Amino acid sequence: TGLAYIDVKQLSKNDIVKGIDGENWIKTKRAKTHTRSNIPLLPIPADIIKGYEDHPQVVNSDKLLPILSNQKMNSYLKTIADNCGINKNLTYHLARHTFATTVTLTNGVPIESVSKMLGHKSLKTTQHYAKILDRKVSSDMSALKSILNKEEEKSRESKKQL
């Protein structure tokens, strides 16, 4: 979802609402900046939330998820990384960064949308936070090359017909 640890910890059942598209969205206010964060709920996070509906810490409260301390969450992420052979120090904040770069920007989500989902006050923050990956630049340039090649082909075909 790209939410910071504290924002996930504070999520309540009331933060899941129908968006203008009729789909479920997380609509909450960021603890750090007090700005709105509006995030369409993708299938995997939706399944995770559904999986905890009957958890004792969730059933009798307004909380959406049973959240441990940030330190404990990071410890679990480290264990998961080790078990998966990932040689990176996974942290909750790194997950937020990965959402911003790899999940959204690399897949063509405009930076303005990413900024809105992350709840940044300024686009400048998102530009600094979610630096464009070399893969994204390469992908964008490949798409541009393809367009230019098609235009060049059309131009050659037009000249042949004259």
Predicted regions located by residue number:
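Short basic/aromatic active-site micro-motif
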Residues: I67-Q71, N87-N107
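C-terminal catalytic core of Y-nucleophile DNA break-rejoin enzymes
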Residues: A31-K50, V59-T79
